[in-house]
A protein has these predicted regions:
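Short acidic alpha-helix that forms the nucleotide-activated donor recognition element
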Residues: 174, 196-205
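Short His-centered aromatic/hydrophobic patch
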Residues: 32-37, 54
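A conserved mid-protein helix/loop that constitutes part of the nucleotide-sugar donor-binding site
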Residues: 131, 135-154, 160, 171-177, ...
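Membrane-proximal helix-turn-helix segments that form the acceptor-binding/catalytic region
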Residues: 16-20, 73-94
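Acceptor-binding helix/loop patch of EC 2.4 sugar-transfer enzymes
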Residues: 2-5, 52-79
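Aromatic "clamp/platform" in nucleotide-sugar-dependent glycosyltransferases that forms part
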Residues: 194, 213
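Carbohydrate-associated surface elements
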Residues: 100, 117
């Protein structure tokens, strides 16, 4: 409740600071990933072209993600969605990841599709025989590696000859390592640093796990 009461003040402060930075930088182009600034970025007078990038699907974000049969909530969802679309329509362009996703935005005429650009050559294709499971991503709450490690503690009891390798780096590394040790998984779950040949690591594994709490079309599955 306290966080909810403080939100209007924090949002006003965020908007003020955001606008100040743009006025000082005077960029030619401002690219937003369409979070809190979506409601006001098109109104800023810094002179830059405003472009939005939408990294998740429409129906898993914001008001569209609300699921309820309550008439009042349905009405609220419709109003929030109208405001959302109106804000998007005022941007110079809205960039999506796939043409399929573009089909969900029939109200907009300012869409562009730019797929994830990384194409990693596959020097080795998994034969499915290695008893290795791989996960890749930042060591951050979004990626859900804490949940994955908890789940792996159950898997390791039934399949002790399998090993989970999690490739990445981030501020949760020490916390995740402590979790691994606490669950007695030191030999069954390994935190590996980022590598340049991640495609080879996929080829050395039999199973890939995406444990994210929320995710767009991630580059780890591209």
């Amino acid at each position: 409740l306290i966080k909810l009461l403080k939100y209007p003040f924090r949002y006003h402060r965020f908007r003020k600071r955001f606008a100040k930075v743009l006025r000082e930088l005077r960029p030619d182009i401002t690219i937003s990933t369409l979070r809190r600034e979506l409601n006001f970025i098109n109104k800023l007078d810094d002179g830059s072209i405003k472009i939005g990038e939408f990294h998740v699907t429409r129906y898993a974000y914001g008001a569209e993600a609300l699921k309820s049969g309550n008439p009042l909530l349905k009405w609220l969802k419709a109003q929030l969605n109208k405001k959302f679309v109106r804000n998007l329509s005022q941007l110079k362009r809205v960039v999506l990841l796939t043409h399929e996703e573009a089909g969900f935005w029939s109200e907009l005429t300012n869409l562009s599709v730019i797929p994830n650009p990384i194409i990693t050559p596959l020097n080795k294709i998994s034969d499915g025989k290695a008893k290795r499971v791989i996960a890749v991503g930042r060591y951050a709450p979004q990626k859900g590696f804490d949940m994955l490690i908890d789940s792996w503690a159950l898997v390791a009891q039934k399949y002790p000859d399998w090993t989970l390798y999690i490739y990445g780096d981030g501020f949760l590394r020490a916390e995740l390592q402590e979790q691994i040790e606490r669950l007695g998984l030191t030999e069954k779950c390994r935190l590996e640093h980022t590598v340049n040949n991640i495609a080879d690591k996929y080829g050395e594994s039999s199973i890939f796990v995406l444990s994210s709490r929320y995710e767009g079309f991630g580059m780890v599955i591209t």
